[in-house]
Amino acid sequence: ERKGALQLNGLLDMQKPHITYSIFKELARPTLFIANSDLEAKKVYNELRFYTKDKVEYLGTDEIYFYHLDAKDRSEEAKKLRVLLKLAKKQKTIVVTSVDAILRKYIPKKVLLDNIFTYKIGDIINLEELSQNLVRLGYERVSRIEGLGQFSIRGGIIDVYSLEYTNP
């Protein structure tokens, strides 16, 4: 398997999702589809979901919703983080994006991967250090978790609602 980019031009719009999925099936790494616009990217994404719902992701540009300015809804941020993690970990997935979205600044791959920490049963955890690390990464310490990006430490029990997962 050769590494590098594959660029296809001259395809009809209706051929793009089918050809992309055909290429994706043959590769053991992520496939990145860059569309001319967010509108085209969303259309290709929706069509690719016909072929594979669980292996296709959409990475769009940041949209500003003025009625959400004060809300602490981090679901869009979480979706982007999950997509970036899949790319960084080289998971087999199709990421559909636009030129505008791909030109945005994202967290460097090394920084992203260096800030992932995993614990298993039996590990001894320094709660103060864990708390500081989570706050440094943008998590909010709360008494009761209600949303993404929050964590709670009560009586030696740690609850984290990671942006990487859909459930706490």
Q: Where would I find each of the regions flagged by the language model?
A:
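ASCE RecA-like P-loop NTPase motor cores
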Residues: 1-168
